[in-house]
């Protein structure tokens, strides 16, 4: 087999990209290798200092902890060097002389957040607090406290030249923060906060992707947590995020979390900052120190570091404030220890235990405080609570199962609608854009379900089933229906909306010669599938990107989009007006004595009502139920407005069914379509010949005589003009014969010219 030059170049490029990609640690140059080694060495040195530290020792050469709050009061321009002249490193007290917190913040933590009432041994707190907590956050002060100088080591800086191999020495002090909005300050007075709590019980090795269960020696007393904290003003114009590790004191319900970056190695500060009280300080210090050391050894902390850790730490140091977070949980004194254990076992492994999960109280933060030592910002929390993660997963699973039932109902309704319009003439009356809008929503839902299945492993099975059901509905049934609609209307593509809406007192000229175009459903299907997937990708990316927009812009986009996507009956109303469907009384009159099934309304009322209800239920749930799983705000007024809008569309469809599809338009606004029922002239008989009887012609389908109405011959005026049909190509057939023929083909049986639908 010969390989041309282009193929060879392509193979070489692919092999180059494959073999030149960074390894498991992300290092792609000697400079980055030295950066990573410097970072690992720095952490190893500081860990050795941490291991030798006792409760009575102060912090020594640990990044971000070299200066106390009192040091900054003494000299606001003090550099973070070690050792500081005259500073005693062999003593430790929980005050501003040794901590990065001012005394009034320490006092607030001791009296308002971690008060002594929580030391009562009778208090019981849940050992598992995995959840998402939502609440309010208030600014206490952003200009009262002195800012502690926290330099960033220069070896974190990216290389400025490809020839560089050695990262620079020294540290960088930011005299003025980069002007990137409000990243280094909090300017709003009141806002909203979301705290995602997860236990560090299942850790993953960054190199070999092995997961191992991390269980510390005092697992019943202490827990290591991962915290993701996001807070912003109500309009979401100013957003802040914190990703940090935390220590959870199960006996006292206290949580301490400290952010970490290249300017603040907070992991080594957890033991000292957890021991605030006068009683058991040293014991708490030793327990937390042992917990941190176990985590360090279990994860091979420095060995698994990658260049991503270097870049993330550097970006966090440049663009974010460091925060210390102190939280106090509400006790669950209504339960015993055995009951709490039973609840945890049932949530982790549901077996039907008598745990009464429906009355399980939320994880409630009764008091909380956030303080930033390098930005001098103090924040307070209130009304922060949330349900257990397992309960939330159970609730979402029920919602997904209900959604699957809705998809099944929608598939059933669509199949009945397809059976109702099982002829080309009936399909021709369906609006292509009506079902395109419905199809776009269903296809996007399928894509979002597939994305969510990879993000939430606990819901993988119901999400995949939902995605599969929605994908079948969108890509098989709805696309197949759209292909039939498009194929039946392909000969109308030259008839634009402007032409249809122009004023015309005449009849639309169906007699002009047109090419006999036979639609190929294979090519139409390929075109529609390509368009479907393209629109699906664009629309899905638009929806996902909108979640990160400011709230006001996001709400405007959301409301407009929902309104447009719930206007799916408008194209069908327009299509009905274009096709000129007669009123119900006229349809009943014309059906007497003949097969006039083609005059039926194109949409079944069961399909219209059922589809409207099915597609309205999710919107009603999200906008009216304040505890919805999407954490969406409540807006009953919008639901009422949307319901009235849908009711208006259905009312117009019903009025078209009763009064005729053009009742609201002036006469002759839209040209009349071709009429198959018309008298013939004497010239027609002379040109096309007659049948075996006088004043008749032969029906090419049944080969029988067709009596016809001839204008010039009065004795033929007794013939019912609806008993025969005249095609645009001037061929005459029995009405029943041609209607049955047009159930399968919209082509003349004689000359194969395209026929306008009934």
Curated annotation (Swiss-Prot):
GO CC annotations, alphabetized: Dsc E3 ubiquitin ligase complex; endomembrane system; fungal-type vacuole; Golgi apparatus; Golgi membrane
Reactions that this protein is recorded to catalyse: S-ubiquitinyl-[E2 ubiquitin-conjugating enzyme]-L-cysteine + [acceptor protein]-L-lysine = [E2 ubiquitin-conjugating enzyme]-L-cysteine + N(6)-ubiquitinyl-[acceptor protein]-L-lysine
One Pfam family cited in the UniProt record for this chain: zf-rbx1
Topology class, membrane: Multi-pass membrane protein
Pathway(s) served: Protein modification; protein ubiquitination
Ranges in the topological domain labelled Lumenal: 27-398, 453-458, 545-553, 624-635
Domain of life: Eukaryota
Residue spans, topological domain Cytoplasmic: 420-431, 480-523, 575-602, 657-758
GO biological process: proteasome-mediated ubiquitin-dependent protein catabolic process; protein ubiquitination; ubiquitin-dependent protein catabolic process; ubiquitin-dependent protein catabolic process via the multivesicular body sorting pathway
Enzyme type, top EC level: transferase
EC numbers for this chain: 2.3.2.27
Signal peptide: 1-26
Zinc finger (RING-type): 699-752
Compartments, record wording: Golgi apparatus membrane
SMART domains according to UniProt: RING
Residues passing through the membrane, by range: 399-419, 432-452, 459-479, 524-544, 554-574, 603-623, 636-656
Primary residence: Golgi
SUPFAM superfamilies with a match to the protein in the record: RING/U-box
Function: Catalytic component of the DSC E3 ubiquitin ligase complexes that tag proteins present in Golgi, endosome and vacuole membranes and function in protein homeostasis under non-stress conditions and support a role in protein quality control. Mediates ubiquitination of vacuolar proteins such as CPS1, PPN1, PEP12 and other proteins containing exposed hydrophilic residues within their transmembrane domains, leading to their sorting into internal vesicles in late endosomes. Targets also the unpalmitoylated endosomal SNARE TLG1 to the MVB pathway.
Quaternary structure and interacting proteins, as annotated: Component of the DSC E3 ligase complexes composed of at least TUL1, DSC2, DSC3, UBX3, CDC48 as well as VLD1 for the vacuole-localized complex or GLD1 for the Golgi/endosome-localized complex. Interacts with UBC4.
Record-given protein name: Transmembrane E3 ubiquitin-protein ligase 1
Organism: Saccharomyces cerevisiae (strain ATCC 204508 / S288c) (Baker's yeast)
